[in-house]
Regions:
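Residue-level signal for pocket-adjacent positions within structured domains
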Residues: 60-62, 87, 121, 128-131
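Major-groove DNA-recognition helix of helix-turn-helix-type DNA-binding domains
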Residues: 112-121
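Basic nucleic-acid-binding alpha-helical/helix-turn surface characteristic of O6-alkylguanine DNA
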Residues: 1-103, 155-178
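Short, amphipathic alpha-helical segments
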Residues: 73, 102, 117, 144-147
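A short glycine-rich, hydrophobically flanked beta-strand micro-motif that places a catalytic Asp/Glu
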Residues: 96, 109-110
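Surface-exposed charge patches
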Residues: 81, 110, 152
């Protein structure tokens, strides 16, 4: 697995992504950079990239990361604010988020699917109302390994999964808080 981050001049995270193909990852982040800050990618030894790997591997007590929110819409920022509150070991649904912020579930789905801060803002903790695992966007596109990656991330966080369904005890409602 290859990991990459895009960081601004203030050491804030602009975007992050990962995937099995380093060329696709670099292309994805380079294109995102051209639309936003025009900065180069971080090196693999940069602390942002190392922190991303730690989180991917399920390490507890993550280091605080400042996000550059200048390049997301107000709607996406509202959705991401909810995502950041989902506790480790829990999931929520597109519908619960949409009810909480007063938006349509499809609009929430678009915001979740275009989350620029992969791993740091846990979009993998959002599942369909059926509590199926669902898919996961890698490098900006849905791939054949998306649901496998999402399952891996959720299992690292001790989300109870039986076959391809999340146990309802892991469901978190943003309107009810923690």
């Amino acid at each position: 697995m290859t990991f990459g981050c895009l960081v601004d001049q203030y050491d804030q995270l602009v975007a992050s992504s990962f995937g099995s193909n380093s060329r696709i990852l670099e292309k994805h982040l380079t294109e995102y950079s051209a639309k936003t800050v025009g900065k180069a990618l971080t090196r693999s030894d940069h602390w942002f990239t190392q922190e991303m790997i730690r989180r991917f591997e399920g390490v507890k007590n993550p280091r605080d990361v400042k996000l550059n929110r200048d390049f997301v819409s107000t709607h996406q920022a509202r959705v991401c604010a909810v995502l950041e509150k989902i506790p480790i070991g829990k999931v929520t649904t597109y519908g619960l988020i949409s009810n909480h912020i007063g938006s349509g579930p499809r609009a929430v789905g678009v915001a979740v699917g275009s989350n620029p801060w992969s791993i740091f803002v846990p979009c993998h903790r959002v599942v369909p109302g059926s509590l199926a695992i669902g898919n996961y966007s890698i490098c900006g596109t849905l791939g054949e390994n998306g649901s496998t990656t999402k399952r891996r991330l959720l299992l690292h966080e001790a989300v109870p999964i039986e076959e391809d369904k999340i146990d309802s005890t892991a469901l978190w409602n943003p309107s009810e808080g923690d």
